[in-house]
């Protein structure tokens, strides 16, 4: 999702997305450790999305 679209979301919606992404990131890490993950860029992309959402949540709370 684009950053502009994320900024238009409510904090509760962002928190739901954050939880979903954290679960996905955990699954990708486990797949990576067990050598089942084919596309390693998924790890970086989810990590970046998590950071973007956390930043937007903090900006909205300030």
From Swiss-Prot:
Pfam families: Ribosomal_L29 (PF00831). It comes from the Bacteria. One of its GO terms (biological process) is translation. One of its GO terms (molecular function) is structural constituent of ribosome. CDD domains: Ribosomal_L29_HIP. Gene3D superfamilies: 1.10.287.310. One of its GO terms (cellular component) is ribosome. Keywords: Ribonucleoprotein, Ribosomal protein. The keyword Ribonucleoprotein applies. Belongs to the universal ribosomal protein uL29 family. This is Large ribosomal subunit protein uL29. It comes from Vesicomyosocius okutanii subsp. Calyptogena okutanii (strain HA). The lineage of its organism: Bacteria, Pseudomonadati, Pseudomonadota, Gammaproteobacteria, Candidatus Pseudothioglobaceae.
